[in-house]
Amino acid sequence: RGIYVVPCTGRIWSGVPEFLRTLPGIQYAITTNGAIVEDVEKHKILDERKLSCAQAIEILELAEKFRTMYDAYVDGYAYGERRFLEHMDEYAIPDTIQNMIHQTRREVPDVIQKVRDTGLPVEKINYFFGDQQERARARRELQERGDVIVSSSLDNNLEINGPGASKGEGLLRLASMLGIRREETMAFGDGNNDASMIRDAGIGVVME
């Protein structure tokens, strides 16, 4: 009927649950909060809005000012450190999210050095906090930069993306590529990082 069902997620595509990745009829996906718009059938990136390598290193180094666990998404993979992955309870991460993190992170000795060594732009950076005051301080500092988008999908995290990387902007860019008017789009979401998509779609539906 000409209707495209498009998963929009903060995750990388390989981190999306298998039942959704294998659902018949899924051709396009918007991943890492809109940093990547891709044709998942053809394994082709259609649009990307990433943090520069230099920006990403600054944001990862900023994390060291706070008591936070962090990771980075580079070239379709998520990288984390053992010092964080073995102590996720300290950052108030629910068991279900811990399981997902263990399944999707590639362990490296030093995330910052990994990003520096690749020299590649970064799709997204996550911060996780056990202390809400620390989270609020970090959010303020990040927003004061003026060159990143800060959102969250959990009560204890911050998700940092480059300019133009939001689910809403990703939705509108994909719609434009497919010749679909904004008024003909609909978005469903239940998280803070869904707000731009719900606002920008022709019809936005907030789920509880």
Show where each model-derived region lies.
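Glycine-rich beta-strand-to-loop/alpha-helix junction loops that act as flexible
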Residues: 33-34, 188-190, 203
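Short, well-ordered beta-strand core segments
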Residues: 29, 204-206
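Active-site phosphate-binding/coordination module
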Residues: 1-93
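Conserved residues at beta->alpha junctions
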Residues: 7-10, 50, 129, 154, ...
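Residue-level detector of anion-binding/catalytic polar loops
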Residues: 4, 69, 149, 203-204
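Short, well-ordered alpha-helix to beta-strand connector turns
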Residues: 26, 122-123, 201
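Basic, amphipathic juxtamembrane/active-site segments
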Residues: 1-2, 206-208
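Conserved acidic, metal-coordinating active-site core of Asp-based
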Residues: 62, 66-69, 73-188, 192, ...
